[in-house]
């Protein structure tokens, strides 16, 4: 399906509300519907990465099946690691070993993808595009998902960042 250059896809955050988004993104992939511009914040940024790499089912699998298997959200993690989410599992083990992320497909995608974070120094939203450095992609999506008080501050390019949904929960930029 052809989408004009003025149309974009906005992926909001909202934690487990992102499960619905997973189904929508799988539908879009099933019908080869692509947008020239996609922007995601928090859970939307995570799910959007699977959409951009065209890994159908990956976002749903990580949000439902792997949650059930690994219990990566909860007070246990907050008390043990000062993080309600097991970020090491989510952003290292999953994409590298358990549920491999296709960075090359993402980097080769002609569509633009932007992830939103909250800059802790300015209190404003920062909008990041990264299509070359996989470590920076992980830094950005980790920052976009770092909830205040229950997740540690993340750093992108040495700048402290938190969840993009704090200041721009439905990014229409």
Roles of regions detected by a PLM:
Residues 1-41, 49-173:
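Patatin-like phospholipase
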């Amino acid at each position: 399906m052809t989408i004009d250059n003025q149309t974009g896809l906005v992926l909001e955050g909202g934690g487990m509300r992102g499960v619905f988004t997973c189904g929508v993104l799988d539908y879009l992939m099933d019908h080869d519907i692509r947008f020239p511009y996609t922007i995601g914040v928090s859970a939307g940024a995570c799910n959007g990465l699977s959409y951009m790499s065209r890994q159908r089912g990956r976002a749903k699998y990580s949000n439902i099946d792997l949650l059930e298997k690994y219990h990566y959200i909860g007070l246990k993690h907050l008390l043990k690691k000062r993080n309600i989410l097991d970020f090491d599992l989510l952003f290292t083990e999953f994409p590298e070993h358990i549920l491999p992320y296709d960075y090359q497909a993402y980097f080769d995608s002609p569509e633009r993808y932007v992830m939103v974070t909250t800059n802790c120094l300015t209190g404003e939203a920062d909008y990041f595009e990264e299509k070359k450095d996989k470590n920076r992609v992980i830094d950005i999506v980790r920052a976009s998902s770092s909830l205040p008080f229950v997740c540690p501050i993340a750093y992108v390019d040495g700048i402290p960042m938190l969840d993009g949904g704090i200041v721009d929960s439905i990014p229409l930029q």
